[in-house]
Amino acid sequence: MNIFYLDNDPIKSAELHCDKHVVKMIIEYAQLMSTAHRVLDGELYEDRTANNRRIKRWRLSDSNMENVLYKASHINHPSNIWIRSSDSHYQFVYDMFVALCNEYTHRYGRVHLTEEKLKDILQHLPNNIASTDFVDPPQAMPDDVKTSDAVDAYQNYYRVYKKDFAKWTDRETPAFMKNISGKDNLSKYMDEELYV
């Protein structure tokens, strides 16, 4: 669970997602938004997993949404708490989700199934979401790459922890990913005073 906040602009941020994240994060952002709808607008009930463990679930009164949205997941994860705390947060993730769907089509020449299933329904904000100003998403990453600036931190996270698999099909490698020789050289790419 994460929100790869690689740029303040959700469209540019989506373009900066590496190939693996373009595929994966479309689903994850849809999961975050689905969870926001269920937790904010749904009715809580107890269910059982396949292993007969108790689990909290939320049922939506709108049968169309109930039957299409993903189940609530990781409700206490900082990214989930953040997205459902503000309409501006939800809107940012939705805009990045749509941009990622476009990015997926650009890179792979086809439409992601999650786009077909959820793009239209997720454009609607949860009914009970608060209207507040935007704050940067939480930095869900190891402490050694965190900084006081969330965009810088997520770019550091990519440089240090995602460099071994990160590639960009039909896109130029982002400037912040160029000339990286290893994890030990992180200080070359950032001002050490930015560490939190």
What annotation goes with each model-predicted range?
Residues 1-76, 80-196:
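Sequence termini and other peripheral, non-core segments
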